[in-house]
From Swiss-Prot:
This is L-ribulose-5-phosphate 3-epimerase UlaE. Belongs to the L-ribulose-5-phosphate 3-epimerase family. Keywords: Isomerase. It comes from the Bacteria. Catalyzes the isomerization of L-xylulose-5-phosphate to L-ribulose-5-phosphate. Is involved in the anaerobic L-ascorbate utilization. It is an enzyme of class 5 (isomerase). GO terms for molecular function: intramolecular oxidoreductase activity, interconverting aldoses and ketoses; L-ribulose-5-phosphate 3-epimerase activity. Its EC number is 5.1.3.22.
Amino acid sequence: MLSKQIPLGIYEKALPAGECWLERLQLAKTLGFDFVEMSVDETDDRLSRLDWSREQRLALVNAIVETGVRVPSMCLSAHRRFPLGSEDDAVRAQGLEIMRKAIQFAQDVGIRVIQLAGYDVYYQEANNETRRRFRDGLKESVEMASRAQVTLAMEIMDYPLMNSISKALGYTHYLNNPWFQLYPDIGNLSAWDNDVQMELQAGIGHIVAVHVKDTKPGVFKNVPFGEGVVDFERCFETLKQSGYCGPYLIEMWSETAEDPAAEVAKARDWVKARMAKAGMVEAA
């Protein structure tokens, strides 16, 4: 029987670094999480996961089965380095190849959702041509994802092109495909001049997962929970009242901390307390 509890997960980069997924999932289970989100970022080490052998992929699947902790989503931020909007044809082709490999990887290991970074370009200057190429790249990517039955979900970003749900919804209407949805980050959403609650309500029906972190205007990473501008309780209440029942993912970058598990446990308790106040979970 499926649980009726709110699924709460932890980002891979919050946990100690390394390539042993059995250990990572065991730790996540000990910390009380339902799932872990995998990172495939722009570093060569994490990009190389897309070239894992059959045996390596099977080891991940076996770790999931053994622990009961799922890996249902991938944060694919590698497109910062290889953007779909690049005016360099070779770089853009590499970005599309990364997308193809990520979708194949997801299909092989049971990942359901690939979170996309909403950058047309990141290290270069954006213009109308980079945005056109980005749109075309998304269209090609969604066609690949449709065939694999893998959902691509756009993150609300630390970047003006995709800094609100309203803007991201423009892409859902443009692509008009059930395999392209939204994966908002309530931290990023709150750091801009957005009506956060209205934005969350506007996205209902397209939101497949939610990133949970704190932010300040212009500061999008490593803001301790409770020290930023995010009104977590109101965000959780809005999502609950709007009928959202999907997963929440605590996003942290504590993998190099002196005691990552302690940092994560502290954040988990803080977030769950706000969820309890919003009537989403029972108070601990």
